[in-house]
Amino acid sequence: MNKKKLIWQLPFLAILVIGTIFIIRQQHVTPYQHDEGFIFGTIYHITYQSDENYQKEIEEELQKVDQSLSPFNKGSIISKINRNENIKVDEMFKEVFLLAEKISKETNGAFDITVAPMVNTWGFGFKQGKAPSKETIDSLRAIVGFEKVSLVNDYIKKQNPNTMLDCSAIAKGYGSDVVARLLKKKGIENFMVEIGGEVVTCGNSEKRVPWRIGVNKPTDDSLNTNTELQTVLNVTDKAMATSGNYRNFYYKNGKKYAHTIDPKTGYPVQHNILSSTVIANNCATADAFATSFMVLGMDGTKKILEQHPELLAYLIYSDDQGKNRVWYSPSMKKILAE
């Protein structure tokens, strides 16, 4: 009886073995493509397993994002909105605006794409400025606030024509999402998309293991040359974004001014968080919350994380003695590579 059962099972076992060998062989035969280029004022790196190279299509998609959301592109939709031109927004703009609005509400305004006039005035945006007066800041607070703009029938409506939008704190993450969607549409199962440090991963790396993504040590590095890592995370089928005040800053009269502006006060944030890394289901969300956590500080961040168990955070902060310390979501421990 057992012999008959074994004979009956043999064909199925053979199919299983052959299928497994075929899959493994295919994984080793199909090469990984390595694309890099320049977009949104930064460098991108994209690695994906495919016989075909899709860099041309990838760049076409990224140019669509730039044409919709870049305030540095004078012909973009967001630039026209900032000039108060009556223009219908596209699907990309709509998707980002609605997500930004949602996260603004969830963070009580810590994330706010209307902060553009303040960012510009401090010299970190798409217009020049540096260390404004208290009077200037007070006047800008009257035109900043996510509740001062709305999307009505595919048009942006402003309460004040001087209100301006800047999606820089979410656009790179969104760009990574757009590329990831394209690759999935092509049937690609193993890839890593990175645009200016904002990452989306799927499947495995060339080494047949989860993608390992580094978190930089937050050392003052305005030239973006520091490659020393604080830690490495195993990130698979997730998105990761990092925000920090150690690259975009300047000193005036011996005081450091960093690029993260608190929309409520109008001033650069002055607390002990040096770097905020967030893992989420999509990169636009990770990007926006990473910026929010830089504004909120440690206590505010922990409150948001209690409301959003789907988010993981890795925070590097300075203690009372000026030494770097780390706090991270308890469930993140399982993905710490080192």
At which residue positions do the language-model features occur?
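Mature catalytic core of soluble alpha/beta enzymes
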Residues: 2-338
